[in-house]
Amino acid sequence: MALAMLRDWCRWMGANAERSLLILGIPDDCKEHEFQEAVRAALSPLGRYRVLTKHFRKELGAKAALVEFAEYLNRSLIPHQIPGNGGPWKVIFLPQVPVIEFQDMPSFPAQPQGQAVAKAAGEGGGAGEAGGVGEVGAAGEAGGTGEAGATGEAGAAGEAGGAGEAGGVGEAGAAGEAGGAGEAGAAGEGGAAGEAGGAGEAGGVGEAGAAGEAGGAGEAGGVGEAGAAGEAGGAGEAGAAGEAGGAGEGRAAGEAGAAGEAGAVGEAGAAGEAGAVGEAGAAGEAGAVGEAGGTNVTKAWVQPWRCTLQPVLENRAYRELRPFSRREQPGCEEESFESWVEHAKDMLQLWCHASEREKKRWLLESLGGPALEVVSGLLEEDTNLSALDCLAALGQVFRNQDTRMTSRLKFLTCTQGPQEGLFAFVVRLEGLLQRAVEKGAVCPALANYLRLQQVLSWARPSEALQDTLRGMQLEKRPPGFLGLLRLIREMEAWAAFPARSQQGVAWAAAPVESEDPAAAQASPAQGNASEAGPGAEDAAEAASATKEAARGAPAAGEGESAPAGPEGLGQARPIEVPWGSSPARMSSAVWVFPRGLSWGPEGLIQVRGQEARKPPLEGLQTILEEPENEDEDGAGDEGQPKSSQGK
C-alpha cells in the first residue's frame, strides 16, 4: 500500500519515483519548523532534496510528505525511520534495482553457428593466423598445434593430442592461448575457430571432434551457448565456458570428455582452469569482442545525451515562481495574493512549452502552508485539473472578500501611523482606494478628490504642503496619485535645506506663477538671496515684518487704490526700517500668490532694492501718498511715512 501510494503521488506530482521518498506517520500537530529540522537532520547528508507536498491522510491518521532528491541514491544509505515529533517516522522508497551481470554490455544479434571467429569477434577478436586454427588448429598429422598451437611443443600430447597445460580439447583441438581467438578470446580454447576448429580430420576426434562446427566461436565469438565444446564435443549446457566464459573446473567437456570418444582429456575431461577459454577468457568482461568491448560502446552512446540533458536540468531555476503560503507569522510580511497571482499567470504563459504535469509540479513547488494544502487536496480529488484551475481555486479561497461597505469604510478610516511616513501612507491609501473603486464603493471620477480629502483629514503633512494642498482643493484641481507623490518628494527635498526654508526661498523645482512682472523678473534672483552679503539677514527680517503687516492690515476697500486683483496682491506697503534708510540697504518685498506648485512655505521672494525696477516703487509711493492727502485734520510730521527713499 505504501509503495502504491508513493508511485501514485509521484505520478500526479510529476516526480521521479526512483529518486523520491515517502515519509509516513507525521503527527497532525507537528509544526512546520519541527518537520523541516527533522528531515534536514536525516536526509541532508544524502544530497540535495526538496519537499514536494505534505498533507493529512485520513486512512493513516497522520500526515505524509513526499521528498524528491536531485540525484539517484544508494538504497543502503537511506534511513528507514526518521526520529521526529510523536515517535519515529517511517520512510518508504522503491527497492534497489538488481544488478544484472553484463548489464553494461550491448545486446548484439545472434550470429549463425559455424561462422568464422573473425566475424564473431570483430576487428579486435579476429582469429587471424593465431586465432583461426584452420591448418594450424587442426594439429597436423601429429595432433600438434603448429606454429600457434595451444601448447606448442609442450602442449602436443603425441598422437592422442592431449591438452597439456592449456587444456585443449581432443588431440589437436587444443588451441592454447592463441587457438581460442588470440588474445581477444573470441573462440575460447575448446573450439579453435570455424568449421575446422578443434581437430579437423587428424585430430583423432572424428566427425564429432573437440569443437565441431560450433565449438569455435559460439554465437558471439564466446564459446557457443555455454562456451567451448560445441554441440558434440562440448559438455552440454554447462560446458566449457559456464556463465563466466570459463571452462568450469571440471565441466568443460562434460563427464563424457570434451572430445567425444577419442577426445582424451583425462578422465575428468576438464580443460583445466584455463581450458576452453585461454588467457582472454572467452566471454570475460570484454564480452568476447576483444579490446573494443561493448562497455565502451555503451558509454560512448550515453555521453552525448548526458551532456545535452544536464544543462536543461540545471537551468530550470529561472522558471521558478515566487513562494506563496498565506501563512500569518509575526514579523514576516508576505506579498498580497493579488500580486502573486498576477505573477503566476505571467509565468504560466512562459511555460507554454511545458506539459500540464510540469506546470502543476512547478506550481506546487512554490506553494506552502494553507495554500499548498488547498491545491494538494484538489489534485488528490481530481488529477485532471489544470494549473489555471488551481489558481482559480486559490482565488476563491484567498482573494479579498470585503463587501462594498467594508471597503469604503476601510478607505475612509485609514489614518497615518505614528511612525509611518507621508509617502508610505499615500501608497497604502491608494491600495484601499483602488479596492473600493473595484467594489463600486467609490466613483472613479471622484477618486482624486477623495484622496486629497483623506490626506488633509487623516495625514500629517507639513504646514507648507498643507497650504498648497488646500489651495488646490479650493481651486478644484486635485492632483492625481503620481502628482501627489511627486509633490511630497519635492517638498521633502526642499525641506532638506533648512537654510533656504528659513530664509523664505521658494521651491527650486517649481516655477513662480505670478502676473506681476516685477515678481516674475525677480524670481531668478531668489537663488542669490542667501549670498547677498550682510543685507541678507536684514532682508529676511523685513520680509517677516511685511508678512505680519499684510496679514494684520484692514480690508483695502476705502480708496480707489485698494488692490482688487492679483496685481494688487503682488504689491505691499513698505515699512519703516529703523536700522537705516539707505537705498542700498532697503529691500522690496513681493508677495507671491499661491497659484500652483510654486507656493513655498513662507511665500516670499527676496529681491535686493537695487535690482527691483522703478515702476513698482512708484506705485507703492502713490499708495502711500493718498492717505496723506485725504487726511483733512492734517497729521504731524511724526505720523507721515518716510518717503525719502523714493525721491
Swiss-Prot record:
Residues 111-199, 227-254, 508-580, 608-647 are annotated as: Disordered. Residues 517-570 have a biased composition (Low complexity). Residues 122-149, 158-199, 227-251 have a biased composition (Gly residues). InterPro entries: PNMA, PNMA_C, PNMA_N. It holds the Pfam family PNMA. Residues 625-636 have a biased composition (Acidic residues). PANTHER family: PARANEOPLASTIC ANTIGEN, PARANEOPLASTIC ANTIGEN MA6E. This is Paraneoplastic antigen Ma6E.
